[in-house]
C-alpha cells in the first residue's frame, strides 16, 4: 500500500463500516434486518457511532471505543478470534506494540438477562480454556481479558474506564 500522510489516517479504513465484505448481510440462520444510516446499510444492532466513525452495538461500547481512541490505542471492534476451530468476536481487541500485550475487552451490558448471562459464562469459560485470562489474574499466554459491565441501573462509569486504562496502558 502506498500512502502519503500519517499512518493513523489509514486506521479509519480498517473499521467494519468501511469494509464492503464486513457490511454484507449474510447470516445463514436468520434473515438480515438492515437499517439505513446516512445512505449506508448496517445490521440492525449496529446503530451507535463512535468518534472514530465505526458502528457499535451499545452506548457503553461507544464510551469504551472513544476512550481507546482518545488514548491513541490501536484497537479493533469485534475482530474475529479463532482458536482450535472455534471463533469468537471479542468486543474490542487492543494490541499494545510497546509491551507486546494483547487485550481482549468484553463489555457485558445485559447480565440481568438469564440467557445473556449463560452465554457470557460459556464465553468466559472458553477464554479461560484457551489461556486468555482476566487481567486481574495477570492475563494468560494468549492475552489478557478485560471485562466491564453496565451498572444495575443500566449506566456506565466512564471514570472507572479511565482508571482501568491507566492501569493497563501506563
PLM regions: where:
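Basic, glycine-rich
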Residues: 132-170
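Solvent-exposed, charged helical/coil patches
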Residues: 2-76
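A cross-domain feature marking catalytic cores of carbohydrate-active enzymes
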Residues: 79, 107, 149
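Class I S-adenosyl-L-methionine
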Residues: 68-69, 124, 128
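Short beta-strand-loop-alpha-helix junction that forms the active-site gateway
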Residues: 89-125
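Acidic-and-aromatic substrate-binding clefts and catalytic sites of carbohydrate-active enzymes
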Residues: 81-87, 113-114, 150-157
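Active-site metal-binding core of divalent-cation-utilizing nuclease and nuclease-like domains
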Residues: 56, 67-69, 73-99
Amino acid at each position: 500500500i502506498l500512502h502519503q500522510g500519517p499512518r493513523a489516517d489509514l486506521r479509519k479504513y480498517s473499521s467494519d463500516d468501511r469494509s464492503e465484505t464486513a457490511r454484507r448481510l449474510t447470516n445463514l440462520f436468520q434473515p438480515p434486518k438492515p437499517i439505513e444510516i446516512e445512505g449506508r446499510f448496517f445490521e440492525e444492532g449496529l446503530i451507535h457511532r463512535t468518534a472514530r466513525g465505526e458502528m457499535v452495538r451499545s452506548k457503553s461500547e461507544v464510551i469504551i471505543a472513544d476512550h481507546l481512541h482518545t488514548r491513541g490505542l490501536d484497537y479493533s471492534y469485534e475482530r474475529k478470534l479463532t482458536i482450535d476451530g472455534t471463533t469468537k468476536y471479542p468486543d474490542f481487541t487492543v494490541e499494545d506494540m510497546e509491551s507486546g500485550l494483547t487485550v481482549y475487552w468484553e463489555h457485558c451490558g445485559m447480565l440481568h438477562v438469564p440467557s445473556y448471562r449463560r452465554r457470557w459464562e460459556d464465553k468466559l469459560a472458553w477464554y479461560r480454556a484457551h489461556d486468555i485470562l482476566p487481567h486481574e489474574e495477570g492475563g494468560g499466554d494468549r492475552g489478557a481479558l478485560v471485562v466491564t459491565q453496565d451498572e444495575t441501573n443500566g449506566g456506565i462509569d466512564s471514570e472507572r474506564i479511565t482508571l482501568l486504562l491507566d492501569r493497563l496502558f501506563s
